Curated annotation (Swiss-Prot):
Localization per record: Cytoplasm
Binding partners and assembly: Homodimer; disulfide-linked. Forms a heterohexamer composed of two FlhC and four FlhD subunits. Each FlhC binds a FlhD dimer, forming a heterotrimer, and a hexamer assembles by dimerization of two heterotrimers.
Family statement: Belongs to the FlhD family.
Keywords for the protein's UniProt record, in alphabetical order: Activator, Bacterial flagellum biogenesis, Cytoplasm, Disulfide bond, DNA-binding, Transcription, Transcription regulation
Protein name as it appears in the record: Flagellar transcriptional regulator FlhD
GO cellular component: cytoplasm
Name of the coding gene: flhD
Matches recorded under InterPro entries: Flagellar_FlhD, FlhD_sf
Function: Functions in complex with FlhC as a master transcriptional regulator that regulates transcription of several flagellar and non-flagellar operons by binding to their promoter region. Activates expression of class 2 flagellar genes, including fliA, which is a flagellum-specific sigma factor that turns on the class 3 genes. Also regulates genes whose products function in a variety of physiological pathways.
Database matches in HAMAP family: FlhD
GO molecular function: DNA binding
Domain characteristics, as noted in the entry: The C-terminal region contains a putative helix-turn-helix (HTH) motif, suggesting that this region may bind DNA.
Main location: cytoplasm
BP terms from Gene Ontology: bacterial-type flagellum assembly; positive regulation of DNA-templated transcription; regulation of bacterial-type flagellum assembly
Length: 105
């Protein structure tokens, strides 16, 4: 895959992520903050971005979303087959809730 293709795919992922994040924040800010792992400050900014600002941010050559499964226990919980899927999801949610939210610091 060529470098220009990779950059284009990063921009597409960024735009899709920003559009989803903004929609989640506008529909239910508290739930969005939990699902996205962002602070109220970031959620407020996401909610106010214009379409032009979203496109400009998405044009970055860096991936804007962060892989939150940096905890081995969490990743193992989500990738192993469990007899009780609901308990597995609840355990994953508890582990994610322990992680600090991202801020503008």
């Amino acid at each position: 895959m060529e470098s220009s293709e990779v950059l284009q795919e990063i921009r597409e992922v960024n735009l899709a992520y920003l559009l989803l994040a903004q929609r989640l924040v506008r529909e239910n800010q508290v739930e969005a903050m939990f699902r996205l792992g962002v602070s109220k400050e970031i959620a407020d900014i996401l909610a106010k971005l214009t379409s032009a600002q979203l496109v400009k941010l998405a044009a970055s050559n860096m991936v804007l979303c962060r892989f939150r499964f940096d905890d081995h226990a969490l990743l193992s919980t989500l990738t192993h087959t469990a007899k009780n899927h609901d308990m597995q999801q609840m355990h994953a949610a508890i582990l994610l809730a322990r992680q600090p939210v991202e801020s503008l610091n």
